[in-house]
Structures are given as C-alpha cells and as structure tokens.
Regions:
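Alpha/beta-hydrolase active-site loop
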Residues: 170-191
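Short beta-strand/loop motif that positions the catalytic acidic residue
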Residues: 321-323, 328-330, 334
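Conserved alpha/beta-hydrolase
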Residues: 148-167
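An N-terminal hydrophobic leader/cap segment in hydrolases
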Residues: 7-102
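C-terminal catalytic histidine-bearing segment of alpha/beta-hydrolase fold enzymes
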Residues: 336, 340, 352-400
C-alpha cells in the first residue's frame, strides 16, 4: 500500500465520523426522518427514556443502529404512519392532485404531490411549499389544497429526503438545500417561468429556502418566509434559554404577612443550611441558577450546531440578496422561533434590510391544538387574505 493510500485512511475515517455526527444532529433538526410517530416518541423519551428504549425489540434497535452508521434512511418493518399518510395521499389523488417525484443531482428520489394549475391560465404558475422539521406533506394537504384554490395556481408539495416515502437520509444542511434546488429545477423544467414561481418556506423550511435562493441568485422567483428563523443557533438559544422565568422578581421581593405588615416577626421564613431564609428568595435563586444552566446549554448546543455545519444562517443568506419579490410572515408570540431571540423578521428590521420586503404579522394564538408557530395560515383570516392577495399579485394571476 502506498504512503498516500495509507494517509488517506485517517482522513476518510475523520470525514465519516464528522458526517455521522452531523447526521445525528440532523435527526434532531429534522425529526420527521424518524419513522412512526416522532412526536409521540420524543414525548416518551423525555418522560421515561430508559423505559422507552428498553421496550424496543433488540432486533429493531440493531436495525436502526445499522441504518444510522450506514447513513441510510430509517425504516420500520411495519410503519402504521406510512399507511395513514398513504390514505391521506390517495384522497387527494382522487380530487385532482397528481403523484410525482423529484430526482436530485445525487440521485435521491423525493416523494411529491402536485396540483396542476388551472387550465384557464395561459402560462403555468406554481407555489412550491418547503415544510418544517416535523412536517410530512400528506398531513398538510387540506391546507395546501385550500392554498392552491385560493391563489389560483398550481402547487408542489414534497418530503425532504428520508421523510415519509422519500429516499435517502439528511446527513448535512447541504442535503436539504439540494432537495429545494431539485424541486425548483423540476418546476422550471415543466415550463414554469421564474417570475411565475413562488417558494413558500415555513419554519426551518424558510431558512433552507432563503439559503437556496440566495446561493442560486435566480432572478424573478418569489419567496415567502413564513414564521422562519434568522439562524439555527439563535433558535436553539430562544428555545433553551428563553426569557427570564416569569415571577422571578416577584419571588425575590419581601412578602407581606396577612395583616399587611412585613415578615420581620419571623413568619414565612425557614431554617436552611444553618440560617433563616425566605422560601421565596431560595426559589428565585434556583430560577436564576436555572437561567444560567439553560444559557450554558444553549451556548454549547449552538456551538455544536455551527461546528457540524448546521447553522442555517438565513439572515446572512438574505444579506447576500434574494433577487425576487419577498414576503415575510412573522408572529410576535411565536412559541418555537422566539421573536426577540430568533425571528428573521426582527433581524431584518434591526439590520434595516426590509426596504423591499412586504411584511405580514400573524396574530392568531393557535388553532385546534397547534400553537402560534405551527397552525396553517388559513386559520388566521387577516394573514391568510394578505398572503393570498400578495401571491396572486406577485405571480400575475388574473382576477377570475
């Protein structure tokens, strides 16, 4: 074996270990890759991690570990969720949608569904929807169908690689950008002009779409950023650290007794560690300590995300310019993308970079169990009407 061949082995091993670590992070960033019910699984792992893992058959654990280390798609022998998604898909195929697929440059086949544009349009106009990290397009077909009908355009919905029936696995952020590029190229290959295409990116899909459009500099393609983030480390910080716990200051303040006086008479104090203290002060100290621990955890997680190439710096991508028309939807009470810490909208405003951007504030606080971040916009009448009007205007859809 030559010296160069010997030297390449450590490099290949290092590259593989890095890719495996990036894939592990990618599972947390895009949990829709997890087969079965990822939401239920995460809840079980948080509430009873050891009991949950012990309940898995050993053969299944071995299978999933092999798929992980081989950088393959996660699959289950019997996945009831795929059956449920197939049923939803069939319902909309019977209602005029078309089954299709998109093949990426690295030969990964993405599962997709397409609603043809109205025949009355002289030229096809399309919305490409890029979903969030828990999303499978099948679950959102009622919303997509309403979106396509209201806007009077065609619609393409797809699952990222490794999600649902799409092949492959997301091992790095570049994989997600590749998937978006492939979907854009597929629509352009169908004869859709760039000026007649709108990419709607929701949540993390908004960050991925922003970076994809900025890297291509595709003139004319419109972009909707829907409750999206400035970067993943900012989002992690907002979720893990958040604002100081509510009530911390009130707990630290001296408390009056029932007669309106102070607590100098010793009421409301207890002996702790050899001295008399107020329980409220101890609780406030614990809350402050929790804030520091959360802050440290957020900083460590953010550093790991950056080191493994998962930063998704949408704000920087935006600064590099997305040449087409742009619309930003945002929610000040977002329960996932913390507005002050992580919102793309606020970052653009602070940077003075909203001059050519249309802005729509989402105000509804939730819908049918969804929080402010997740609910379909059709549930917010004002934001919905604004979105549809701007999409129709931008794509040049004639009034019916």
């Amino acid at each position: 074996m030559s010296a160069s061949a010997v030297g390449s082995v450590p490099r290949q091993l290092t590259s593989y270990v890095f890719l495996l670590a990036a894939r592990l992070v990618g599972i947390f960033i895009l949990p829709a890759q997890v087969p079965g019910d990822p939401v239920g699984l995460i809840e079980e792992l948080f509430t009873a991690p050891l009991a949950t893992v012990r309940s898995w058959p050993s053969a299944l654990v071995r299978q999933l570990l092999l798929q992980l280390v081989r950088l393959e798609k996660f699959t289950l022998p019997e996945d009831s969720q795929l059956v449920r998604l197939h049923t939803m898909r069939q319902r909309y195929l019977a209602a005029g949608w078309e089954a299709t697929s998109v093949t990426t440059p690295d030969a990964v086949v993405l599962d997709a569904l397409l609603r043809p544009p109205p025949a009355a349009l002289a030229e096809p106009r399309f919305v490409l929807f890029v979903g969030g990290n828990f999303q499978k397009y099948e679950d959102w077909l009622p919303y997509f169908d309403a979106y396509a009908r209201a806007a009077g355009v065609g619609f393409l919905a797809f699952n990222f690689r490794g999600v649902g029936r799409s092949e492959g696995a997301v091992c790095c952020a570049a994989d997600m950008l590749t998937d978006v590029h492939a979907c854009i190229d597929a629509l352009l290959a169908r004869g859709v002009r760039p000026a007649h295409l709108c990419v709607h990116g929701f949540s993390i899909g908004g960050a991925v779409s922003a970076l994809a459009l900025a890297s291509r500099q595709q003139p004319g393609v419109a972009f909707v950023s829907d409750r999206s983030l400035r970067s993943l480390p900012h989002t992690i910080y907002g979720m893990v650290r958040g604002l100081p716990p509510s009530g911390a200051l009130e707990a630290a303040a001296p408390r009056a007794d029932d007669n309106g006086g102070g607590a100098d008479d010793g009421e409301g104090v207890v002996m702790m560690h050899g001295r008399w203290v107020r329980p409220g002060l101890r609780a406030a100290a614990l809350r402050r300590a929790e804030c520091w621990v959360r802050g440290a955890a957020a900083a460590i997680a953010g550093a790991a995300v950056r080191a493994l190439g998962w930063e998704l710096p949408a704000e920087a991508g935006w600064a590099a310019r997305i040449p087409g028309p742009k619309l930003v939807l945002y929610h000040r009470a977002d329960n996932v993308v913390h507005y002050e810490a992580a919102s793309l909208h606020l970052a653009l405003k602070d940077a003075g970079d909203v001059g050519d951007v249309q802005e729509v504030e989402v105000r509804r606080l939730g819908h049918r169990g969804w929080g402010p971040h997740d609910f379909p916009l059709v549930a917010d009448e004002v934001a919905w009407k604004a979105l549809i009007a701007r999409v129709r205007e931008t794509l040049g859809v004639p009034d019916s």
